[in-house]
């Protein structure tokens, strides 16, 4: 129904995305290029993401904290690879209070440096380990080609930072975060199948010895990096003197990790599940799981809407009533664009027969149900929708991943999907050849799809594609 409102995906996918963000009341451009205003509906989706991920993070033993937005430039200069990697994106404050600062201040692009400084202060003994921290914050990375949610100069995220006594412990925890927090959230809440793997050296986080990633396929066949976990080895510990006294009384360097997911997941949600009618939100994520719409603004109809909504709330569902202004058709279109999983239509004719209509957003199917069973039916349908959305996305991922023999074939296949080939067929020369066509190696995997320990393992395959 919303096809006349939104640009069709097949006609212009970027324009379709912009239409959904604007007409779905998700976000707007801020007054400074690259900044973003997240509107209430977009914020409610991010809040749900925060809540689901935060609960999983806390289950690992990590604790939330907060560190400063302003970081001395000298902190970044201590880790050469880190500052080199972030230098083009840094926003730097040189004046404050009407005077030039003695030392420039970086507006936080990520917090490894400042958190490393305090880890060195707080960690004295092996008894202080592991130190497991997480913060929810904004970060600034100056973006030349901004796009709402996907690339903005300021965005929101969570970033976790940990310190451990051994490489084995640091690796195990970073892997735990990647599988039990990110992958679990992506599959079971966002209904997002991804390829889990590690980044090649050319794509690693600046200063990391290994970067794990979860790569999702959007409706246009491009990749979106959904979340990353980084093993930092002892690079940052060495730069910031993060030592601990071992049980034997020796001073030893810690091993650290960092990991993060951001509001670009909201963009991923739009492009992964959306259709020509707008956003489609998985029920477990949806801030509004069902909307009850009055076909006419009549007292009997409005009373019935209240009863239906009350039954949904009693069933533990998140529900909204739309008595609404404007035509019934216009209101239906607005809710379709927002992607609410279920719509209950309450009209005077149906009420005479004691029934209402229940409509699925994901496939448009409609049921006519008596008022006394609609809430329980909705509960069952919401789980079915969650299951169906994941399986549909999983099928698209499989159907549009093409096994190829060499870089030339990968270049062709990556025009509208992913290509998978032997990593030995790529190497540095192959990566350079792919980049000429705006294609990158998204991740490396073992042949069984599992994550390797590092990129030097034998017999690895790589996933390559264009990306956001």
What do these predicted regions represent?
Residues 1-468:
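NTP/phosphate- and nucleic-acid-binding module
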